[in-house]
């Protein structure tokens, strides 16, 4: 049996709150401790280990301590890199440190690795524009998998278009065919799907906590523990104890009653929740809404509200949006800048430190990127 964990995004402080950063560390350690308690043979981390390529010391230590506990329990760890782990300008991703110290095994280079009688292979996040360069490598690893008699696990951090058209970079037909389990990352919602042309289930455990790109909603988060004691892998869902989130709709005319009902719901919870009210109606007065929302402040970790405008078909204009906000930002930035590399530099590397007013760090990143660009031109 092994654990399949993905999109941990260690270091993310949603809404700038330390409590949200600690929430992620809490669910992450819960997943690791559960894996140890259940005596899994190994753990797969399917990318986006960290939220940014240059994570804080706290985030680095959280991962290191978890890997140490796993290793002390006789449990091996394997990982690939997601786009949040990879900087466009830094040559060595932080997770490589764990590989070099033998805390974990990096398998994102496409080279097969045999763990006891299980065949493992993985690929780091591949951009859509790079996929054509990977067809031969996919064929090579597929051939090696076909010749192996036991279980074969492919680890990737990719979106599949048949599962999510917004965040998909490749179709299921592009993937190697001869694996018995596809340990996927990148999509933050849980999916488990079988394709007739693939040798096993395609599994996305989703993120371990709700992240900024997912909005505020009541959603279960967790990971898979996969039984491979028989010919067919059996993925079992393990739910993690995340902070409660409440998303409600309310009519402006009944706002007082709606907030009272939310307060009653909050009274039943063990933790202060994150709350969003979507308010519709005629002649909405923001000052009145703000005054009513103040009733929630002391009982929530974070609360916000949005006015819902109806279009001519009487449907909400806020309900239509891409599932993966990060990828949509990169798409829009690519269009504006004329370069996907520059867009990823801006969104992945510069946006967070700029938001925290880390001007010196941003300046250094820009200088390093310029130096790399100049060397390429020579």
Task: Identify the residue ranges that each predicted region occupies.
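N-terminal active-site segment of His-dependent metallophosphoesterases
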Residues: 1-66, 146, 353-364, 372-378
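Domain-start "cap" segments at the beginnings of catalytic or binding domains
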Residues: 1-22, 210, 221-243
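A short, well-ordered alpha-helical element
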Residues: 29-39, 139-140, 255-269
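Short loop/turn motifs at secondary-structure junctions
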Residues: 39, 119, 150, 178, ...
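His/Asp/Glu-rich metal-coordinating catalytic cores
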Residues: 42, 53-220, 224-227
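Accessory, non-catalytic peripheral segments of nucleic-acid enzymes
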Residues: 230-378
């Amino acid at each position: 049996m092994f654990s399949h964990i993905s999109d941990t995004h260690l270091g993310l402080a949603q809404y700038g709150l330390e409590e949200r950063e600690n929430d992620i560390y809490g669910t992450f350690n819960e997943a690791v401790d559960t894996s140890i308690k259940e005596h899994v043979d190994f753990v797969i981390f399917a990318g986006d280990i960290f939220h940014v390529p240059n994570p804080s010391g706290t985030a680095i230590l959280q991962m290191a301590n978890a890997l140490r506990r796993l290793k002390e329990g006789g449990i091996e760890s394997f990982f690939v890199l997601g786009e949040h782990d990879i900087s466009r300008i830094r040559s060595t991703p932080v997770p490589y440190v764990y590989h070099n110290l033998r805390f974990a095994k990096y398998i994102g280079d496409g080279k097969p690795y045999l763990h006891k009688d299980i065949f493992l292979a993985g690929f780091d996040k591949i951009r859509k524009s790079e996929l054509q360069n990977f067809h031969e490598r996919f064929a090579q690893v597929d051939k090696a998998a076909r010749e192996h008699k036991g279980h074969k696990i492919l680890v990737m951090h990719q979106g599949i278009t048949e599962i999510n058209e917004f965040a998909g970079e490749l179709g299921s037909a592009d993937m190697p065919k001869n694996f018995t389990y596809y340990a996927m990352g990148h999509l933050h919602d849980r999916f488990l799907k079988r394709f007739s042309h693939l040798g096993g289930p395609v599994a996305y455990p989703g993120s371990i906590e709700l992240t900024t790109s997912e909005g505020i909603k009541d959603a279960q988060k967790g990971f898979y523990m996969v039984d491979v004691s028989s010919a067919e892998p059996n993925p079992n869902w393990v739910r993690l104890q995340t902070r409660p989130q409440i998303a409600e709709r309310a009519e402006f005319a009944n706002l007082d009653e709606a907030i009272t009902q939310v307060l009653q719901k909050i009274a039943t919870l063990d933790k202060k929740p994150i709350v969003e009210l979507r308010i519709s109606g005629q002649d909405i007065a923001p000052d009145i809404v703000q005054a009513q929302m103040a009733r929630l402040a002391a009982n929530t970790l974070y609360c916000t509200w949005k006015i819902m405008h109806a279009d001519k078909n009487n449907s909400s204009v806020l309900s239509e949006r891409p599932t993966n906000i990060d990828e949509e930002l990169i798409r829009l930035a690519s269009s504006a800048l004329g370069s996907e590399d520059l867009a990823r530099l801006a969104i992945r590397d510069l946006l967070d430190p700029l938001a925290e007013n880390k001007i010196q760090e941003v300046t250094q990143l820009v200088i390093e990127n310029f130096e790399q660009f100049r060397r390429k031109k020579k």
